[in-house]
């Protein structure tokens, strides 16, 4: 990621994610009343009793948006573990039961590297991103799931851990 940041340093309108904030989102629930949190924690905890730890291998890059108007640069997996898809589906089922709507988009497991507001040199960006070697960048054992509360700030999102569940 540091090499990519150096190559794209002239692009001042890319907001790079702080390495401490890198995460994979299973379900974004948006504004949530405080009184819903205990029930969410209880239901997610019960659901996670059916899951075991697994490993994710982040070995490919991609963008959301189009080649001509990219919005997000991300790191994903060529072979997503079935355990992650099962975990995501069970998570959605919990939130269905609690009355939360599902996203309209399909689940694309990824970690966001940077959010792109605007590019000065689109062709150069396409060349750099198109030339990124597809190799194992991060191998991550998944031993816990964290329920975060996020706060949007001008400098980026700030995350507060509400509950950490071991699996």
What are the language-model segments listed below?
Residues 1-167:
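Histidine-dependent nucleotide/RNA phosphoesterase domain, centered on the 2H-phosphoesterase fold
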């Amino acid at each position: 990621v540091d090499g990519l940041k150096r190559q794209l340093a002239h692009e001042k309108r890319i907001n790079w994610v702080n390495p401490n904030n890198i995460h994979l989102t299973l379900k974004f629930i948006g504004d949530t009343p405080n009184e819903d949190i205990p029930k969410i924690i209880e239901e997610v905890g019960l659901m996670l009793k059916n899951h075991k730890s697994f490993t994710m291998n982040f070995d490919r890059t991609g963008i959301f948006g189009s080649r001509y108007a990219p919005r997000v640069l991300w790191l994903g997996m060529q072979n997503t573990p079935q355990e992650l898809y099962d975990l995501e589906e069970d998570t959605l089922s919990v939130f269905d039961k609690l009355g939360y709507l599902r996203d309209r988009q399909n689940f694309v497991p990824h970690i966001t590297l940077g959010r792109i507001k605007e590019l000065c040199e689109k062709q150069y960006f396409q060349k750099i991103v198109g030339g990124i070697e597809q190799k194992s960048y991060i191998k991550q054992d998944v031993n816990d799931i964290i329920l975060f509360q996020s706060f949007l700030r001008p400098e980026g999102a700030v995350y507060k851990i509400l509950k950490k569940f071991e699996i």
